[in-house]
Amino acid sequence: MKFNQFSYIPVSPETAYQELRSLGFEVSLDASAKANFESFVRKYFLFFEDTDLALKNWIADPETDLLSFFQSDRPLTAEVFGLVALQLLGFVPNVDFTDSVAFLEKMAFPIAFDGSLNNLHQLLATRTQSGNTLIDQLVAQDLIPISNDYVFFNGKSLATFDTNQLHREVVYVETPVDTDKDGLLDLVKVTILRPNVDFPVPAMMTASPYQQGTNEPSSDKLTHKMEGDLLVKPAGKISLSRPEIKAPEADLTPINPVTKAEERFAHTDTYTLNDYMLARGVASIYVSGVGTFNSEGFMTSGDYQQVLAYKAVIDWLNGRARAFTSRSRQHTITADWASGKVTTTGLSYLGTMSNALATTGVDGLEMVIAEAGISSWYDYYRENGLLVSPGGYPGEDLDTLTEFTYSRALLAGEYLRHQKDYEAYLNELSTAIDRKHGDYNQFWHDRNYVQFADRVKATVVFTHGSQDWNVKPINVYQMFRALPKSLEKHLFFHNGAHVYMNAWQSIDFRESMNALICQKLLGLDNGYTLPTVIWQNNQSEQTWEVLDNFGHDNGKHIQLGKSEASIANHYEEEIFAKYGKAYQSFKDDLFMDKANAITLDFELDQDIQINGRVHLELRVKSSTNRGLISAQVLEMGDKKYLAPIPAPKRMSLDNGRLFKEEALRELPFKQAKYRVITKGHLNLQNRKDLLSIENVTPNEWMTIGLDLQPTIYKLNKGDKLRLVLYTTDFEHTIRDNSDYEVTVDLSQSKMTLPY
């Protein structure tokens, strides 16, 4: 374990004293450091009447138990403090470590000992080996009582709300859209978990089309075949118009108003970051949206109709929209329990809706936590004029996702009434996505949130993984960079895949979010500042660093070679079938120079930290009137790399007081032969830009530019890079087995590494 502490807020000695005393620690400004430390440690043993016995079972140094030390005249030293602090944090001498000084240094222990009460204050805010901070662990053991009121420590809310006595209620919010065109504004189901208190509370809202269930069997039937010819597109220019994001004024007329919801629930799937804050006085709201189980309308998949339907829930929390107690629309109900301040949460589609909601500029949305979210749907299903499936899902497209999330059809009565109209709508959508050409068009433009980034007012927190080939890093990169310069924004850029990071051992992400939520939603003047970019170092285990930005302008140019080289697109049928059946076998061969590709190896002559988009400038020609080029950059070398999927450690994370416990996780640091740094794909007809389609003349040289997926990746002098240039990518692109070649003039081609 390593300590990476970004959530601690430095305080004055007076504040440290006051906060320690308020929690029951009997420290004194006049007492010695040793006396205060003894009082602090004895308080730790909440379940012991005889704390002398507990102290005898801990050690102050390899020869002295802790009780004997406290009874002696010896002063408290940094070495004794460090060894006892390790035991307080759950580390076991002679098992987890033998040399405490070296162990503390190796773990980057964040506390510099000076004997002050600030040391004890920061120790409470430090994570234990189990993943909980020491103060959270003690509160879970009833250090302070459940009060159903806010208690803050170091600018963060503690778990003082009763999660056994929550309000669990359902309302149906009236949206400004009628997506199924039945003449009625669509209602969306809202599932609410909130503390049982008599004062207004803020809310964490998760907009998830998956929340009420999915229709996987129907979606699987629509999965597209990836085999086929790359189409020759007519040359031309694509024209677009800016989408309108306007909703009619809401009708706020009450109808037989009531103050209590009539529908309850026993269980719903939850997100543990929401659970963590629920125990700390922030309501949890889950909304599936239009076209889902027990809501109304059709699934419009990423357009602003879907977004405005989610926005209506925030409007309802602020008195700007109506909600009904049931879909019969007989009684309206207000959110009289809500303060109106909201943060959105969730990963993938959920993070996507966080991005989209932020661009509406809706009042009340104070903070957005967008984890691995899409910022432009074209960049999820397409790339540079090509069909490019999300990693791991070849053949998926927006129509299959629409079918997957249209859970309204899981209700047989709804199926009976609406399926015919829905299928007609789905056919229109399947045409509009234009799998034939792979081009950007008005349909995709209507689902591009980046163009409205200037409307964002909320504080934005992004998380994204360098190894996320599902929602690729371009999505966070372009949104992060498009936000107004004056806006407060933050990015946690890790080395994982398409994964949550709130349960990781190496970083205090959830505590950082606690501090930020208290500041933005509860109005707590805690002085908390979060760095702009927090990056997980790819070269070592559990190491995080602060950076100033994502994307730098400096570039290191690498000439690709001195000759020409060709890529054969065609494979023998047996190999083509094998790769199509198991794309991982294609990737294995590709990276080991066993597939149809140009493989170029380079040894770095300097240290470099890639930050941004690796750019390829290639002089190419195709033997036919079409073609595509794919590229991947890898670090080669048999050594340890961070694996992309977090491994569970132990079931030790407590999100309250024995509430929604979950497994602690971390990216394993494992031996491997290589690591993918970045990748990209381009239709040669889109070599100028996304909106320009040009002819490809057989055997005529062209200069193309290809920006690969953005990343942050550290390399040392002597490290080996491998650039692989190829055509068909069996994981991502159309699988065209035509017999043509793409030739690259390496002497006129280069790779630029941004730093």
Swiss-Prot record:
SUPFAM superfamilies in alphabetical order: alpha/beta-Hydrolases (SSF53474), Galactose-binding domain-like (SSF49785), X-Prolyl dipeptidyl aminopeptidase PepX, N-terminal domain (SSF81761)
GO MF term list: aminopeptidase activity; dipeptidyl-peptidase activity; serine-type peptidase activity
Keywords: Aminopeptidase, Cytoplasm, Hydrolase, Protease, Serine protease
UniProt-listed Enzyme Commission number(s): 3.4.14.11
Catalytic residues in the record: 348 (charge relay system), 468 (charge relay system), 498 (charge relay system)
Family: Belongs to the peptidase S15 family.
Quaternary state and interactors: Homodimer.
Entry protein name: Xaa-Pro dipeptidyl-peptidase
Record gene name: pepX
